[in-house]
Each structure stands twice: as structure tokens, then as C-alpha cells.
Amino acid sequence: MAENNENISKNVDVRPKTSRSRSADRKDGYVWSGKKLSWSKKSESYSDAETVNGIEKTEVSLRNQERKHSCSSIELDLDHSCGHRFLGRSLKQKLQDAVGQCFPIKNCSSRHSSGLPSKRKIHISELMLDKCPFPPRSDLAFRWHFIKRHTAPINSKSDEWVSTDLSQAELKDGQLKRRNMEESINCFSHTNVQPCVITTDNALCREGPITGSVMNLVSNNSIEDSDMDSDDEILTLCTSSRKRNKPKWELDDEILQLETPPKYHTQIDYVHCLVPDLLQINNNPCYWGVMDKYAAEALLEGKPEGTFLLRDSAQEDYLFSVSFRRYSRSLHARIEQWNHNFSFDAHDPCVFHSPDITGLLEHYKDPSACMFFEPLLSTPLIRTFPFSLQHICRTVICNCTTYDGIDALPIPSSMKLYLKEYHYKSKVRVLRIDAPEQQC
């Protein structure tokens, strides 16, 4: 009997997990430390679990019935209110229609469809019109006005494409360009070319240049052979096969010859003059003779502001330069000559200029007369060595003669060149000789 009772108790617990209640699962999953329950207690717990499961099943079935009843009532109400209009629609569409009756929903499809950009392209014939062919405030109208605003008008009568003042040189260049273009176009015998004629207010330039080298080439045969509409206009650019086969450097030479202005031969006459106060410069203690700027900077290093020295310029186009101390550093300025006057800037008439160099140095000794960008020559740096006797003799001879008078002296030619070293040349006359015109 004991064995049978044990088998019965084992058979009671062996059942699928789906039929067990939550309390049974908890009991099976929880480790109990106490004694095992008796058969009567197990049977009571099993009966309680069955009753609980039955109650839960009935509640779930009632809820499902209520949901089905509510959905069916909504469908019936919709069918009753709207008639047969909703037949064949899905539940989602019916719910959207039902909600839309209480809360009106905008139709998004029409709004988005109108906001989408149009795929239609604006034709070139429509751009040629003076007025916009599209409805106002449309996307195509906006694009039409945008293109017309940012492109130049293709109209020969517009003032922007007309040149009012044309010189003879421009007329000749235009004739040459036009002839070259006609020669390049003659190779196409099947094409009728119509060059654009540009008129001015004064006269009709039939043989004149085309402003900007622009030509509208219209091919009549290509329009007839094409399958495009009659409103379409074709702009073709005809290029010559002869020029296409030419090397690049030959084309560049031709373009350079067309673009370069006519050349003129100029003849400039100079007069050579000796430095007027070479003897006074030689006797000035601030004159150091031949010296470069690096040696001058080494001498002026650490000297007070306004210290200066006069030296020969290292450049052949200039005779003298001054090195001075200002703004805590050593600076240099060339003495320029223009029209027998000496200054630190010969191209600026406002800058002080003097007929001799000693007068120029005397002017810049006063700090009040010196601008912030001009050299300050207040304290001369005394020379520490004497000049050679040969150099002193040259200064004395140059003080007594002129540049052309040196050639009359009975001295060797090498000595004449030595005496002419300190001289400058001044421009006297500029003669322009026109080149002979090339007949086209």
C-alpha cells in the first residue's frame, strides 16, 4: 500500500507546465527548507489552483468578447453612418475616417504633391521670350526669372553688347578676326553661316569688329534634319579642321599676333651731366665713398637715432645712398634724380627735392621738417680715413669742366672714363617712330 501511495503522489505532480498555476510554479521553483506537504494539503492546493485558473480564463474570455463587441459596434456605426462608402476598405482606413470625423485631418497627399519640385525643364525658346510664359508664383516661373536675371540678353540691340567708341586699331583687329573666322567656316559647304552684325548709335559697322569676338552660327540643315520641335533653336559652334590639326604652339602664336597691339619704335635722347657738387661731397666728413649696406649697418650699430652716413650706391642706376639710424634700427634710402633735381622720391612732387646733394642733406637735418617715413639726417658719422689723391684730383677736375668737355682734354681715354664715372643722364626727348602698317 505504501508503494501505491508513493506512485499516486508521483503521478499527481507529473503534469505539463502550461496547466500549472503560478503558485505551483513558485513552489516548484523555490527551495523549501521545511518538511514536505501531505497528500491532503497538496490536493487542496491543486483544487485552489484549478479554481483560480478557471476564474482567470472566464475573465479573459469576457474581455475578448467585450473587445470584439466594441470593434463590431464601431464597424456597425461606421457602416450605418457612412453607408456603403467604406465597403472594401481596411480597418486602418476606416479608423482614420472615423477619427477624421471628430478631429478633421488635412489631406497630406495633395499638399505634398503640390510642394514637390516639377521635373519639367525650361526650354531655350521660352527663355528667349520677354515675358514669363509660366503661371505666377510657380516653381517654373521662379526658375525662369532667376535664369533671366543671371544671364546676358541674347539681343544685338541691347546696350550692353554695343561698343560706342571704336578706334581704328580695334576696327582693323575686328576685320582680321572676321576674315579668319570666315576662312575657317568656308570648309563647311553644307552649312549656311549668318554672322551677327552689331550696330552702334553713330554708324553701321558692317565690316567692323564683333564685340567680345562673339558670333551666332545657325545651321539650317541641322534644324531640318533634327527630330526636335520647331520652337527649338540650335546654337552650333563651327571650328575649322585646318586649325584643329595645327600644333598648339602655332595656334598660340596666331592668337598672340591678333591680341598684341601695333608696335612702335621709340627713340629716347639723353643728356649726360656730371654731379654738380662732387667737390663739396668729397669734402663732407659724412661721405664714406664706396660701401655696401652691410658695412654701413655695422658702422651704425648701437648709434643714436638720427646718425647717418653718405655712401656710393651699390646699384648702377643710382649714384648715392644714405644709411641712417631711426626707429632703433638701421635703414637705407637711395637718392634719385629727375629733371636735374635730387630727392628721395623723384616720382612724388610733394617730396622735397634739391638741385644738389649737399642741399638735400641739409634739409633733412631738422627733425621738424622730416616726416615719419622720411630719413632723419641730424648727426653725421665722421669718416675715419682720407681719400686717395687720384680721387681728390678727379673731383677737382670735374668741378672745373663738363661731361662733354672731358672729351676735349689731352688725356688718355682710360682717364677720360675715370673722370666720367660720377655722372647722371637726364631724359631730353622721346621720339616715337610708327611702324609701317601691315596690309591685310
Swiss-Prot record:
One of its GO terms (molecular function) is 1-phosphatidylinositol-3-kinase regulator activity. Residues 12-29 have a biased composition (Basic and acidic residues). Residues 376-425 form the SOCS box domain. Keywords: Growth regulation, SH2 domain, Signal transduction inhibitor, Ubl conjugation pathway. Transmembrane segments: none annotated. One of its GO terms (cellular component) is phosphatidylinositol 3-kinase complex. Residues 1-10 have a biased composition (Polar residues). Residues 286-381 form the SH2 domain. GO terms for biological process: intracellular signal transduction; negative regulation of epidermal growth factor-activated receptor activity; phosphatidylinositol phosphate biosynthetic process; positive regulation of proteasomal ubiquitin-dependent protein catabolic process; protein ubiquitination. Residues 1-29 are annotated as: Disordered. Pathway: Protein modification; protein ubiquitination. The SOCS box domain mediates the interaction with the Elongin BC complex, an adapter module in different E3 ubiquitin ligase complexes. SOCS family proteins form part of a classical negative feedback system that regulates cytokine signal transduction. Substrate-recognition component of a SCF-like ECS (Elongin BC-CUL2/5-SOCS-box protein) E3 ubiquitin-protein ligase complex which mediates the ubiquitination and subsequent proteasomal degradation of target proteins. Inhibits EGF signaling by mediating the degradation of the Tyr-phosphorylated EGF receptor/EGFR. This is Suppressor of cytokine signaling 4. It comes from Pongo abelii (Sumatran orangutan). The lineage of its organism: Eukaryota, Metazoa, Chordata, Craniata, Vertebrata.
